[in-house]
């Protein structure tokens, strides 16, 4: 008989709720500022008519730096945010047409999703060919990732729950016909809650940006959806063109002889 588990897996709402609450902490707000700085370098160069923020872990307009006018935020529960049109929907089942959105931003949604593959497939479905996908997630190859090995498994730190590396994201996106444009990261301080300690370690920021630019606590991955190259089917040839010439000659001869007998 199988013994019961001591730690039950948390649901997506539990993990999302704890991470959302963590973003209200001082450390969480500092990371969010760094992530918005990353988005500020990426979004202005992406154009189109419709932009979608998929998932709302923070009550902020993460599409603020985008030049696209129509901006949507979609999730199962939403807080009103100025500049974003709300769409109540599951991130893995959107009421949007295929190939209808130019830019999709996933803000730590894959870190808390019970089925990240399904979320990625849905983002791919609604994206136009040549549309762009921006993924923000916690970086396992950072000081924050190393921090996992020094914490107990029951720790409430949200980023310990599910960490997906940029390399794994790249593999998944390749299978979905995406080209990875590039990856950047931000916030090179360790995840310590004491502000005084973070200030004393502030020298790590310029050092990390210079020598370990993809080793920040949070990464932003930009990918472009490929254009499907469809081979057009040949039109069906008329039936007479498909018949052999000999058969055509025989058919015409029989028609002529029949016409002569009637005359």
Residue locations for each model-derived region?
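Class I SAM-dependent methyltransferase Rossmann-like catalytic core
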Residues: 1-44
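Class I SAM-dependent methyltransferase SAM/SAH-binding core
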Residues: 37, 41-94
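A short acidic, Gly/Pro-enriched loop at the edge of an enzyme's catalytic core
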Residues: 92-104
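A short glycine-rich, Lys/Arg-flanked "PGG" loop and its adjoining helix->strand segment in the class I
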Residues: 117-132
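Conserved class I S-adenosyl-L-methionine
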Residues: 132-160
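Short alpha-helix
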Residues: 160-183
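Conserved catalytic loop of SAM-dependent methyltransferase domains
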Residues: 180-205, 214-215
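C-terminal lobe and adjacent flexible extensions of AdoMet/dcAdoMet transferase-like proteins
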Residues: 203-263
